[in-house]
Structures are given as structure tokens and as C-alpha cells.
């Protein structure tokens, strides 16, 4: 499991404002009261490496989006059942694009978009929204992809002559002059 931590006044007097995480990680700790309320039934983020922050004019004050890559370990969900039934668990990692709507006015967050991204087993990924689509950058595979809102791949690109790729972003280039 992972935690997303917002820190205010980071350069002067750092103060933790809130935490997004599975409740079990912070249970009975001094930080438990800083957890944002999770609206809905979904597995909190796991093993993410990067987060993309975005705003929208459609949102109210105090609301914003966090986009991230999430690795869902189905063994976490099955292990208790399998162990009690004497079953054998398989390595069940599945990867998803997650988009949270964070609402600081009510100290809560909810999962507003979840798209399964097949055949990615490395956690070296970055995800960002682009219109209704999603841009996925996979450093270890030296590729980036664009998916539509249904999770269908629209394009896939590879980079040659490099050991590793940096995160890839896509922007409209509006307001730029050439």
C-alpha cells in the first residue's frame, strides 16, 4: 500500500494537511485523524511512483484531480480466503489508471475514473489525463501510450537508442508561438 501526503508550508514550517491511503496503514497512529474520507468501495492506491495534479473550471473551490498509476494486487484480496480454504494463490498483479476527485472542503476523495491498463508489470509508470483520454508513460519499457476513456489503446510509441525513458506528457501547445 502507498500514501499520498499533502504538506503545507513545506519550505518554512511544514505541516501535514491530509493523507490519502488505506486506513489500515495509519490505524492507531498519531496520523490517523489526517486521513481523508474515502467515498466508495475501491482498493486505495498501491505502489504508485508519480501523481499528476490537475484542476478544472467545472470543479468547486477546494476540489482538484489526482491521476496516478495503480497496481492492484489481487493476492491481497484473495489471500485470506485462499489461506483459510487451503487454496493456492497466483501472482495477480493488475495495473490501472486511477483518477481521484479530491474535495478538501469535506476532507474526502473518491475514485472517478478507473481504466485497466493490460500487460504492464513494472511500477515505473506515469499517468496523466488528456481530454477524455489517458497518457501512460512506461520508463522501463521505453514506450508511451494513449488510451481512450473505454481503456482502448489509441496509439503506442517506442523509443530506441536509450536505456530508459523519461516521463512523457501531452499538451495542446495552445498559447505557444512558433
Give the positions of each predicted feature.
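Histidine-/acidic-rich catalytic cores in large beta-rich domains
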Residues: 1-178
Amino acid at each position: 500500500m502507498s500514501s499520498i501526503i499533502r504538506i503545507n508550508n513545506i519550505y518554512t514550517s511544514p505541516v501535514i494537511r491530509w493523507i490519502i491511503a488505506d486506513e489500515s496503514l495509519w490505524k492507531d497512529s498519531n496520523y490517523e485523524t489526517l486521513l481523508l474520507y474515502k467515498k466508495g468501495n475501491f482498493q486505495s492506491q498501491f505502489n504508485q511512483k508519480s501523481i499528476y495534479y490537475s484542476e478544472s473550471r467545472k470543479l468547486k473551490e477546494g476540489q482538484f484531480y489526482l491521476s496516478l498509476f495503480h497496481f492492484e494486487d489481487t493476492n491481497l484480496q484473495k489471500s485470506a480466503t485462499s489461506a483459510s480454504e487451503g487454496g493456492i494463490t497466483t501472482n495477480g498483479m493488475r495495473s490501472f489508471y486511477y483518477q481521484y476527485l479530491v474535495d478538501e472542503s469535506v476532507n474526502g476523495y473518491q475514485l472517478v475514473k478507473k481504466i485497466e491498463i493490460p500487460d504492464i508489470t513494472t511500477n515505473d509508470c506515469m499517468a496523466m489525463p488528456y481530454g477524455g483520454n489517458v497518457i501512460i508513460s512506461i520508463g522501463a519499457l521505453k514506450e508511451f501510450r494513449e488510451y481512450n476513456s473505454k481503456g482502448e489503446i489509441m496509439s503506442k510509441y517506442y523509443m530506441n537508442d536509450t536505456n530508459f525513458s523519461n516521463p512523457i506528457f501531452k499538451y495542446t501547445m495552445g498559447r505557444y508561438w512558433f
